[in-house]
Amino acid sequence: MAKKTPGTNGKQKLFCSFCGKEQDAVKRLVAGPGVYICDECISLCNEIIAEDHEHSHEKSEVFSEIPNPVDIKSILDQYVIGQDHAKKALSVAVYNHYKRVNLKEKKSDVEIEKSNILLIGPTGSGKTLLAQTLARIIKVPFAIVDATALTEAGYVGEDVENIILKLIQNAENDIKKAEIGIIYIDEVDKIARKSDSASITRDVSGEGVQQALLKIIEGTIANVPPQGGRKHPHQEYLQVDTKNILFILGGAFVDLPNIIKSRTGVKTIGFGSEEQRIQAENKDTLMEQVIPEDLIKFGLIPEFIGRLPIVATLQELNVDMLKQIFREPKNSVLKQYTRLLELENVKLTFHEDAIDKIAELAIKRESGARGLRAIVENIMLDLMFDIPSRKDIEEVIITAEVITDRVTPTLILKKESKIA
């Protein structure tokens, strides 16, 4: 209700309903239904609204100081050994993607397309670690999903929308944060269609999934079941805009070198171990020559490849690279176990020949970098079980025989006695 009081001449005096100032004390009083507001209160309201707008603009400019490609690669170098070409491609793609997000927020006239990425490389070559590290660098939510668990709608398996749900959960249910996150879809080569010609039968975990993923990867408003599982008509959905979610897809694409070889006519000449070395080098060289037609021949549909403008290949890891991976990265297996034993006041020493054998065994198992941890977990299990309850151990020494012959690691006791 507007405030009115009797004036000296008998007329009603009007007051601002907000600050209480009389009509004579302000420049203007604007009337509404039963209320009045003065020009000063209007100015104050405008300032508050402008401040709110600035704060929301600042919030949308989360990536105004995104690290440049050189800085991104420098951080990747601390966690992933080798793979320079892939790291450069990822650094540029991620930088441009989040610059694109900022342009969207600023309502730019220039439409920059999404930089979704396809990583091609053997198991354990660092695809997942690269994607995880990128998300940490940019400080955005991250989710990993397995393409083999996905099927098209109406069949047993997960709907493709569930990959968005995992990102929302990792964003602490903040949809706005999830909408600028990164999703890594692993084993995407497993959803290749069964032949390079169109099939008249349903391929529910292959081409059907590729078709279902198209819109989500390109950018759409996805209806996500809040509890996961299959969608049904009577439930409410979370609506998520995927246009600013960066999708990184990875796979081993085991038969791809043969497809490239048949196109390029490359032949391998050599004998014994020399032949194996040449084949490994040729394989890496071949993979670098991959073109969309090769991926179509492999079983990815053209529309799907069209949503993945950046293709980066990772090299097969050799013994020297695996030894570096074992020792050098910030979170290397060696550094992690060294730190774990330091917390028990025990020194951990790996002989050089032991590291050689670990790398050779990982190569033999074809498990790549992730195989290193599995090997060390196996040899360290009994030690990690016993050491916390023992206070007499000063040092643990791992020799080559521990790896090859399963002998017990050497323990140096604080009394300087040695138990083999």
UniProtKB/Swiss-Prot annotation:
GO biological process: cell division; proteolysis involved in protein catabolic process
Record-annotated ClpX-type ZB domain positions: 3-57
SUPFAM superfamilies noted in UniProt: Glucocorticoid receptor-like (DNA-binding domain) (SSF57716), P-loop containing nucleoside triphosphate hydrolases (SSF52540)
Binding site residues for Zn(2+): C16, C19, C38, C41
Xref: Pfam families: AAA_2, ClpB_D2-small, zf-C4_ClpX
Keyword Hydrolase annotated: no
Gene3D superfamilies membership: 1.10.8.60, ClpX chaperone, C4-type zinc finger domain, P-loop containing nucleotide triphosphate hydrolases
GO cellular component, as recorded: HslUV protease complex
The organism's place on the tree of life at top rank: Bacteria
InterPro entries, per the entry: AAA+_ATPase, ATP-dep_Clp_protease_ClpX, ATPase_AAA_core, Clp_ATPase_C, Clp_protease_ATP-bd_su_ClpX, ClpX_bact, P-loop_NTPase, Znf_CppX_C4
Entries under SMART domains matching the protein: AAA (SM00382), ClpB_D2-small (SM01086), zf-C4_ClpX (SM00994)
The entry's keywords: ATP-binding, Chaperone, Metal-binding, Nucleotide-binding, Zinc
Positions annotated to bind ATP: P122, T123, G124, S125, G126, K127, T128, L129
GO molecular function, one term: ATP-dependent protein folding chaperone
Family: Belongs to the ClpX chaperone family.
Function comment: ATP-dependent specificity component of the Clp protease. It directs the protease to specific substrates. Can perform chaperone functions in the absence of ClpP.
Quaternary structure and partners: Component of the ClpX-ClpP complex. Forms a hexameric ring that, in the presence of ATP, binds to fourteen ClpP subunits assembled into a disk-like structure with a central cavity, resembling the structure of eukaryotic proteasomes.
Protein name as it appears in the record: ATP-dependent Clp protease ATP-binding subunit ClpX
Organism from which the protein derives: Leptospira borgpetersenii serovar Hardjo-bovis (strain JB197)
Gene designation per UniProt: clpX
